[in-house]
Swiss-Prot record:
Family matches, as InterPro entries: FLO/LFY_C, FLO_LFY, Floricaula/leafy_C_sf, LFY_SAM
GO MF annotation, one: DNA binding
One GO term (biological process): cell differentiation
Subcellular location: Nucleus
Source species: Oryza sativa subsp. japonica
Residues of the DNA-binding region: 221-225, 290-297, 361-364
Gene behind this protein: FL
Designated name of the protein: Probable transcription factor FL
Amino acid sequence: MDPNDAFSAAHPFRWDLGPPAPAPVPPPPPPPPPPPPANVPRELEELVAGYGVRMSTVARISELGFTASTLLAMTERELDDMMAALAGLFRWDLLLGERFGLRAALRAERGRLMSLGGRHHGHQSGSTVDGASQEVLSDEHDMAGSGGMGDDDNGRRMVTGKKQAKKGSAARKGKKARRKKVDDLRLDMQEDEMDCCDEDGGGGSESTESSAGGGGGERQREHPFVVTEPGEVARAKKNGLDYLFHLYEQCRLFLLQVQSMAKLHGHKSPTKVTNQVFRYAKKVGASYINKPKMRHYVHCYALHCLDEEASDALRRAYKARGENVGAWRQACYAPLVDISARHGFDIDAVFAAHPRLAIWYVPTRLRQLCHQARSSHAAAAAALPPPLF
């Protein structure tokens, strides 16, 4: 007899050991580190490599605060403004090949990012559409099960629609504000570049000045001018010509203040009324003084300074005829051309010789009229027969 059977017979109760326990499952290996995303823009040096852009130019662009992501998000017009600022602020000689090379590098990088992110974006958009469709189906199923839309649901949906409308209007207002800031920055850079060109030689064209607008920020409301006689106060909410000429005297005082502060700090002081003077005037509260308006009537102020009697007579004549200020402004050109004829049609010398006009740039239109008068005078002199002796 087997001893185990005897033990089993003597002790009917014993532990049932059962099958052996399985071995513990080893933990899964840690996931590999995620690869760097391929749709991230490269550094600016890598982006322009091979496109003929010098490293010194890249360094200047970086000093202005531009990165590769910023340049990729900019439009062609904004790129032109950036290059103009680079040439105006740093006096940097940007080569023609560098301009085209930078644009070509940005186009290539945009194409690379679009090709890399297109597939991933398509996958995400598909899953997003599926999720949205599932939500719509679940909402319809709940509505069908409950027998329609209740009053509470209707009220909540109306409130949600109002909130979305408010969010949309706020987003549109924010977009307009950002666009206005960009336009103001672009205008400031264009004005700075125009002043640099004026200092090198010659003033800016009147069409550019009139289309440039009033500069950044909101100004106080400026009422229109009317033709008034000397000493006459304009009625209603309008300003007379004496007030207009007073603005030019204020600009001269602001220029003196800017020059004294520049000398005090050891900076280069302007010799003419530039954007620096207009910005200072706005800073001290004289926001009614702006560059387009002052450049628009500078030849009228010149006639007032050079020949005050002729200016007063012209004002009285146009006031008696009921002409507007635009017609009076155009009529101020002819006396100035006659004055320049006494000095060899050199209107720049006429401005430079007068202490109150030397701080203003000669309008391009006035310079053109003097040049045409000089040409006509020379042609008429050449057509005369020689004297007989």
